[in-house]
């Protein structure tokens, strides 16, 4: 079920109904907002199929921020989305292109075993497939405007997404 072409996907991070990603479908084209962890990727791909489109129809993966419960699966998911561009905050993009600091930091906090259990192996996203967006910049999905607004409260690399068509905010971890 969707409203305004927005499908909510439970990423199954840690427990049910704790973390979500979104699939926006407009005129047969798709965009994800956030992606969860590597373990979430099969759920996201199933949502694409349930929405009646294919992974080749996904044009955008927009991450609100690089914390691993929201963007840890970006590298793996992008491998499955041949036509997608990853959209990221200027402070987030370098960590998605080269996740070594994310890996080191999370491993230091959680340990190797928990890191693997919760997030899996983080993969880089090729720089050529990453689009950095500044505050107020708009990305388009089949004519649907998605505006990226810098919201550094939760993390300095966080932005929220305003979808004018549905009059909805995608807030990541910002209230």
Predicted features, each with a name:
Residues 23-25, 136-163:
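Core dinuclear metal-dependent hydrolase active-site scaffold
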Residues 13, 37, 68, 153, ...:
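Short, glycine/acidic-enriched loop or turn micro-motifs at the edges of active sites
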Residues 96-149:
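Metallo-beta-lactamase
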Residues 1-51, 55, 161-171:
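Conserved beta-strand hairpin/beta-sheet module of binuclear metal-dependent hydrolase folds
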Residues 39, 68-69, 94, 101:
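Short alpha-helical
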Residues 42-88:
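Active-site metal-binding motif and surrounding structural segment of the metallo-beta-lactamase
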Residues 33-36, 58-65, 87-89, 151-153, ...:
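Active-site neighborhood of phospho(di)ester-bond hydrolases with catalytic His/Asp-centered motifs
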Residues 87-95, 99:
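A short, structured active-site edge motif that brings together acidic residues
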């Amino acid at each position: 079920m969707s409203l305004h072409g927005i499908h909510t996907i439970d990423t199954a991070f840690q427990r049910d109904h704790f973390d979500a990603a979104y699939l926006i479908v407009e005129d047969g084209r798709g965009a994800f907002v956030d992606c969860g962890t590597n373990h979430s990727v099969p759920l996201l791909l199933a949502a694409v199929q349930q929405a009646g489109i294919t992974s080749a129809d996904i044009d955008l993966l927009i991450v609100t921020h690089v914390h691993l419960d929201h963007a840890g699966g970006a590298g793996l998911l992008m491998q499955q989305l041949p036509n997608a561009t990853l959209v990221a905050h200027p402070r987030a993009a370098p960590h998605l292109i080269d996740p070594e600091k994310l890996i080191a930091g999370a491993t230091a906090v959680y340990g190797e075993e928990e890191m693997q259990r919760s997030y899996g192996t983080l993969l880089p996203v090729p720089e050529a497939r990453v689009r950095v967006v500044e505050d107020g910049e708009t990305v388009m999905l089949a004519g649907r405007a998605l505006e990226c607004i810098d919201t550094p409260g939760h993390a300095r690399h966080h932005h929220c997404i305003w979808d004018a068509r549905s009059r909805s905010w995608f807030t990541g971890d910002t209230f």
